[in-house]
Amino acid sequence: VSWVKQPKYYLWVWAFCFVMALLDVSFFRHLFAGFTDDSGAGYLIFDSADESVYLTGFRLDFIIYSAVPIIVGYYLIFKRKVESERYRFIYNLYVLTNSVWLLCMYASYTNRIAYLSWQLLPIVLIYPFLNERIYASQYRTGALIALGHLGFTLFMAFVYY
């Protein structure tokens, strides 16, 4: 089915999941909790009065971190017309797995769910700059994006937390 390969549909799914996260719709956390055992459900459904709960809530820092490759991929696919089927597959997979995290964002230890998409993050950012002909200074741009990503990651790890 050709529409399954179109990134715009995955972006619509991500936007829907973002709105659900913004509105704190708990339906999806309860739905996902039904698929797991009690310990897994405990992460998704928690008592907000419990002070031992990991930092939860609307994580703007995580959303910014996750949105950067979505924005870069959007620019490359729709504005620069990168036609690589492999890149579109990796990009769509990243957007889809990140969408699942958005639905569970208010759960405890949500970064464990986000890691499923974040492992693809460097590939989504760098792959087209190494394997596609985009423009003359693409290697420099790719290196700057990689350094920016590394800098933000180190900032979040050592300064922010």
Predicted regions and their residues:
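Helical transmembrane-bundle signal
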Residues: 98-101, 124, 149-153
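Short coil/turn helix-boundary motifs
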Residues: 106, 132-136
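Transmembrane alpha-helical segments
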Residues: 72-73, 121-133
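Signature aromatic-anchored transmembrane alpha helix within multi-pass, membrane-resident enzymes
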Residues: 135-155
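Alpha-helical transmembrane segments and terminal signal-anchor/GPI-anchor hydrophobic tails
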Residues: 2-113, 159-161
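Residues within membrane-spanning alpha-helices of integral membrane proteins
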Residues: 91, 95-98, 121, 143-147
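Hydrophobic transmembrane alpha-helices of multi-pass, membrane-embedded glycosylation machinery
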Residues: 1-4, 118-123
